[in-house]
Amino acid sequence: NGFSMLTFLQFLAEKYLEEKLIMYNQGKRYGQIVFLAGGAGSGKGFAIRNFMEKEKFKVRDVDAWKTAFMKLADTTDKYPEIKGLSLKNPRDVMKIHKFVKDKGIKEKSLDLLLRDVNVKNAPNVIFDITMKDANDIGDVLPKLLEAGYDPKNIHLTWVLTNYAIAIKNNQTRTRTVADDIMLLSHEGAATSMY
């Protein structure tokens, strides 16, 4: 009949990658909040770019702010305390992380984003977070609800990656996180998700 049945081992040897487009609330253009959780190097950025209709969302990514501030520091006289830092150096990554945190960028930019939100066309927002602690969500949720976002349109997605793969990803990406921070971010995400 020309059709042959694969043995179980042959079946396992065939490596199928099934990719799915994630459409929150059937792909609505407004009013969706996504908390995208996952440890450092887990592939959250890859998931956003390839599986999540990025064009429909404002993406809040602390790493993008770090890069922007470093570029400003390196090309202007602003922020001399971070001038010349490298995202490939884990110590520098910690310094720039502290710099952004101390400036209150996350809070200020969220306040600006939500300041003039119209409930009918509130922007879709992805929060790219490690979720190493539940405060990653708990700190912003009241502001989102106050702005008029409907709780049924607030989603939590966990990008779960084998830790060994995340370590390899960390070594080859543009921003390298210290080993202890890597472990804490993955343990914290797992604890928060469970």
Show which residues each predicted segment covers.
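Pre-Walker A adenine-sensing motif
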Residues: Y16-G27
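The Walker A (P-loop) glycine that initiates the GxxxxGKT/S ATP-binding motif of P-loop NTPases
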Residues: G38
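Conserved phosphate-donor/acceptor-positioning beta-strand/loop module used by diverse small-molecule
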Residues: K132, Y149-K168
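Short hydrophobic/aromatic beta-strand immediately N-terminal to the Walker A/P-loop
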Residues: V34-F35
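Conserved substrate/cofactor phosphate-moiety recognition/catalytic segment
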Residues: I48-P123, N135
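Conserved glycine(s) of the Walker
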Residues: G41-G43
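Conserved GTP-binding G-domain of TRAFAC-class P-loop NTPases and closely related GTPase folds
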Residues: N162-Y194
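Short acidic, low-complexity intrinsically disordered linear motifs used
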Residues: G2-K15
